[in-house]
């Protein structure tokens, strides 16, 4: 349903969200609750405080995404802006809402010190938000989360792969080429089966396993044709680029590690029977994460210079190594328990890499990053 919904123009989606049929389905899927129920959900995590008395406080602009509004008195309880708003309220941070989709977005932004949003993952929204954050940050001098650097690498596997290559990070052998002749050479170099991906796509959307030369040649011919290949988004086609990744046949799970400041969270993900894709399968397990994997994720986040990052890792028993599958600025957060060990929710304190410790607690990751962004703004404002 989610994939099909991406095919629909935004103005049509907006009207559909108002219908009883859409609302009923959303309620059934727990992606819509009454506004009166939101506070109960948010209070699953204790109030997060700044832990510092700020002499100056920023005026924060919170960007709402249209996909969070179901219509009437219902809303998607997973919407990140609800957590941003909660943090501002609990810490007496002045805030307002910014509709960045309108033509007067620049004028409306002038009054704010800090703009924060959790972007929609479709390419149309990504292109818009990337362009506007560039103006906000580099021309208007606004503090933004995500920053232009952070949004540039989000939901773009090609760009992320360039950064892995530049920093020499241990990724699954992956190649991105815009050259048809080289694409034909790469399929022989990597061997079968191999994984191919579209540059934009989450929850394993756009990820395919290619098993035979016939499939590979057909895909390459189509990708480098005049029209390219259709993707999950009807207005965007895969054209003149080929993303090929070695298939690691002895991997039985992957790890998602999420990092904010000096805190790390994470869990194991498993594919459905008969499938190779763990992302989007919904099969997760929360338990202790190996320190080797944590340190690799920390290194990746540091090199990619992102204040919040999810790092997906795969473990090969044969090679006794963890490899980067991909990274993401935003991950879906359904619960304030993103790490649980022996039934106890908490996080890893990674302030000392030689002494990583598990500490108890429940947190909304969105609140943690907003806290860090506000403190960062405060320190810069004192200079």
What are these regions (language model features)?
Residues 59-173, 184:
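Conserved N-proximal alpha/beta basic substrate-recognition cap immediately N-terminal to
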Residues 245, 306-319:
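A short glycine-rich, hydrophobically flanked beta-strand micro-motif that places a catalytic Asp/Glu
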Residues 205, 209-300, 322-323:
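Phosphate-binding site of ATP-dependent enzymes
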Residues 288, 315-383:
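C-terminal active-site "lid" helix and adjoining low-complexity regulatory extension at the edge
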